[in-house]
Amino acid sequence: MVREDRSTWKANYFTKLVELFEEYPKCLLVGVDNVGSKQMQEIRQAMRGHAEILMGKNTMIRKALRGHLGKNPSLEKLLPHIVENVGFVFTKEDLGEIRSKLLENRKGAPAKAGAIAPCDVKLPPQNTGMGPEKTSFFQALQIPTKIARGTIEILNDVHLIKEGDKVGASESALLNMLGVTPFSYGLVVRQVYDDGTLYTPEVLDMTTEELRKRFLSGVRNVASVSLAVNYPTLASVAHSLANGLQNMLGVAAVTDVSFKEAETIKAFIADPSKFAAAAPAAAAAPAAAAPAAKKEEPKEESDDDMGFGLFD
């Protein structure tokens, strides 16, 4: 098989990337740091039928995206995020499910000296099973220990490595001796591209109820601003109508203007005693029901006593 020259390969790559953006409405921009070729092959197999994965050099990705901005200007949002080792996962399925599949294919890895820790590494109190000759490793890391039954025992919780720190040779050696593989590597979602909109992966964690609360909060904010500047919007129109009705009722109360909603207020102003008499009558109705209930009690007692007298 004749291998295509570099210029042809680049042209084919540009074409493929553009076609994928046209075919798929959404994709995940993923980081691929510390992902080996074998693991990448396993990820591709797991995503087969669900998503299309495309990697490439950053310079080629940027060039391909810039060349397609005329047809799809929204791709410009991706350009600032094409840094370090990245790739694309194109899909037509639910983005949250695709991310879950990527997380399922993360692999555990040892802490190599010189690597940047992707997470905190802590050691709980434990018996290490190591002999006293290994005490120097713990002393170098200032880990409090004691010898119990001929083995080294860690006394307290130890925060061995902090996220973002470089792994030292002593930390790496100790974790290897303990058989601990604290890190895991895989495709990490950095940005989500969905029909021209770019957002962070945290949005995928939001539930329907959280979205509803945020939407209602936004509607309330829009209504408040609209009312403050006297600019009617769909969110504020109900409040504007209610405020307008209150103003009209206030005008009707002190003028001869009358309409159906104002009749009760006008009647109250004309003769408040009618409403004062109605209030005790309404309160008396529940009170009148109480004696009626009490009158029924003797009847119930007589029924219970029938046939069970003291002299039967």
UniProtKB/Swiss-Prot annotation:
SUPFAM superfamilies: Ribosomal protein L10-like. The keyword Glycoprotein does not apply. Phosphorylated. The keyword Iron does not apply. Residues 287-312 are annotated as: Disordered. It comes from the Eukaryota. One of its GO terms (biological process) is cytoplasmic translation. InterPro entries: Ribosomal_protein_uL10, Ribosomal_uL10, Ribosomal_uL10-like_insert, Ribosomal_uL10-like_insert_sf, Ribosomal_uL10-like_sf, uL10_eukaryotes. One of its GO terms (molecular function) is structural constituent of ribosome. Belongs to the universal ribosomal protein uL10 family. Ribosomal protein P0 is the functional equivalent of E.coli protein L10. P0 forms a pentameric complex by interaction with dimers of P1 and P2. This is Large ribosomal subunit protein uL10. It comes from Caenorhabditis elegans. The lineage of its organism: Eukaryota, Metazoa, Ecdysozoa, Nematoda, Chromadorea.
